[in-house]
């Protein structure tokens, strides 16, 4: 006698999707982080778009625009906090995803691993730009500290930092 989960039309779908899933036997919860990265990225893009609708580049009104988002925009406080905490969750998932790849030896697949490394650098550069560009003195501090690491490059480091800054120091809003 066959099991009902293998013969009933509706239960057969559930059986093939969850119980008899054609997946490796060593699959674990560590394999969820790639899809969680996609979800975090979608949340970041959507909340970032809504926050960008209220962006102002004037340094005198930048903090007023943040206050406006939190007080006057429907669920603006939620959008702002989802964007801020979503970035942290994104990087936690990213590092766990890389850790899973290291643990399971995915670095032996050179092409796939190298594309992942390139994507990691692209994500870091994008996060840096998102941190430095929009608002206030913390962005100036971030730009100064992070770009000063480039001054460690022999011969061209100092010139490179001044070129990125557009002068001898970061000044005014960086997005106009």
Curated annotation (Swiss-Prot):
- Location(s) in or outside the cell: Mitochondrion inner membrane
| Entry's Gene Ontology BP terms | mitochondrial electron transport, ubiquinol to cytochrome c
In the UniProt record, does the keyword Phosphoprotein occur?
no
Tell me what topology the record assigns in the membrane.
Multi-pass membrane protein
Enumerate the transmembrane spans: 33-53, 77-98, 113-133
- Comment on bound cofactor: Binds 2 heme b groups non-covalently.
Q: Which UniProt keywords apply?
A: Electron transport, Heme, Iron, Membrane, Metal-binding, Mitochondrion, Mitochondrion inner membrane, Respiratory chain, Transmembrane, Transmembrane helix, Transport, Ubiquinone
- Residues annotated to bind heme b b566: 97
S-S bridge residues: none
Any single GO molecular-function term of the entry would be: metal ion binding
CDD domains according to UniProt: Cytochrome_b_N
| Annotated GO CC locations | mitochondrial inner membrane
Q: Where does heme b b562 bind?
A: 83
Major localization class: mitochondrion
Superkingdom: Eukaryota
User: Which protein family is named in the record?
Assistant: Belongs to the cytochrome b family.
The function of this protein is: Component of the ubiquinol-cytochrome c reductase complex (complex III or cytochrome b-c1 complex) that is part of the mitochondrial respiratory chain. The b-c1 complex mediates electron transfer from ubiquinol to cytochrome c. Contributes to the generation of a proton gradient across the mitochondrial membrane that is then used for ATP synthesis.
The extra comment attached to this record reads:
Heme 1 (or BL or b562) is low-potential and absorbs at about 562 nm, and heme 2 (or BH or b566) is high-potential and absorbs at about 566 nm.
PANTHER family (UniProt xref): CYTOCHROME B
Identification of the protein by name: Cytochrome b
Please give the organism: Sciurus carolinensis
